[in-house]
Amino acid sequence: AAYTENVLDVLQRLKVSVLWRDNNSDSKGVALRVPYEDYRNPDNNPACDIECRDIGMLSGLPDYIDSREGDMLIVLHQMGNHGPAYERRYPATFQGFTPACNSTELAKCSHEEIQNAYDSSILYTDYFLAETIEILKQYQDRYDTTLIYVGDHGESLGENGVYLHGLPFAIAPE
């Protein structure tokens, strides 16, 4: 990524305002040459307790949009539903499925507890996406707004004794 242009570089060269907001594990070099904001700590993210929540990336987003003219691309790199600490991916108010696994040692939890913790993290992601859509709706008269959601990988929740996403696709459970 350091020596090769990617789509963000090309868009920026075409005068598209590009912003990468990160609440995950950095951009892995993808956002090296575009504006980058780190939301993995409470300095930028107002939604931190045991972990900084994805919803914090929406803080100040309308101000950013209001300060720009023309086309823009905003990347919100979520922590999302990454395991094994599913219970850290959502605040307690979003624990919609119980009993839930509250350990990173998934072998100590039942399949139901793991599934419930994961499902609660999905519930929180749904909330995050709904809030993002509400912000975009505010700009429909000024911009053609679009939300594109892309997951970076699937997740195994104990099927055939496999957890997380560490297996090659060829041998991953169906």
Report residues per predicted region.
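Catalytic domains that recognize anionic headgroups
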Residues: 1-174
